Amino acid sequence: MLQKWKRCCKIESCYIADYVRRNEENKMAIVTTTEMFKKAYEGGYAIGAFNINNMEIIQAITEAAAEEKSPVILQVSAGARKYAKHAYLMALAKAAVEDTGIDLALHLDHGADFEICKACIDGGFSSVMIDGSHYSFEENIEVTKKVVEYAHARGVVVEAELGRLAGVEDDVSVANDDAIYTNPSEVEEFVSKTGVDSLAIAIGTSHGAYKFKGEAKLRFDILDDIAHRLPGFPIVLHGASSVIPELVTEINECGGNLSGAKGVPEELLRKAATMAVCKINIDSDIRLAMTAGIRRVMTAQPDVFDPRTYLTVGREEVKKMVKHKFTAVLGSNGKA
């Protein structure tokens, strides 16, 4: 793969290199999120960042993106790297780019420290998240700045987090009592001192399939305040699966036990996408779609033991769900 440097793009007062890895024919690429976010902010839509764990999920997401002509981010959690290994996921992402002919960003989700971010930067990722939200404000700035300096020198962009989301997902576990809304008065100093390219904030979403006990609410007042303080700056929402009720129902009817599972209503996510939110993370809905498809086959055809049979159905369920997100929630279809 050839490495090419595109023109520098300005995000507020910070310049970053729009780093691109392209094949020799220059037809397809793993790209940064710089141009994606710029267009999304101006266009009033958001980019879906979908967590990947295996070949079928990658195929489903990228085929959906190609068919809907939507920009897309594939993101890898610590759990995914442990399960599938970096080399396999990197190769699968490149294969998906070659097969579908789309551009995509490859992002590290919830990088726990500098070393894991460095490994992903050196290993071909175009974007990384350093999650210093469990540190003090000053320590978060310090570790984020270190990652930013290393990443930008190599053409990779960086996402950071202010505030803490509740919930459990892979290696991320935060009790409800430890969740903290993002303080808008801190964002300008944080972005200025770190040089970070996008910021994940806490406004009421949470990780996992059990996001709300009562009425689902998001603090749009916090989002609006931050948007006014950081005009044009890309904001990220984590824990933004809708925990699609139809999928939960089917899983439960096919022997599952997801009683009380509840996600973020799609209308709230669509509203966020029309504001400053340029990236919306989706993981639980992928797991639910895959599981519903597999359980459907195993329940209706208990004699099936060929993994291709039930994984094909699971893949199609994920693809259908992702296409729905592009068109009805993110508003990103036709924007690639």
What annotation goes with each model-predicted range?
Residues 88, 211-215, 245-252, 273, ...:
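Histidine/acidic-residue-rich catalytic or RNA/ligand-binding cores of hydrolases
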Residues 8-27:
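Short, Lys/Arg-enriched N-terminal segments with co-localized hydrophobic residues
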Residues 28-48:
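N-terminal amphipathic alpha-helix/helix-capping segment at the start of soluble metabolic enzymes
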Residues 237-243:
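Long, repeat-rich segments with strong aromatic
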Residues 253-258, 264-336:
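C-terminal alpha-helical cap/extension of soluble enzyme domains
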Residues 33-37, 54-75, 79, 88-100, ...:
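Alpha/beta enzyme core
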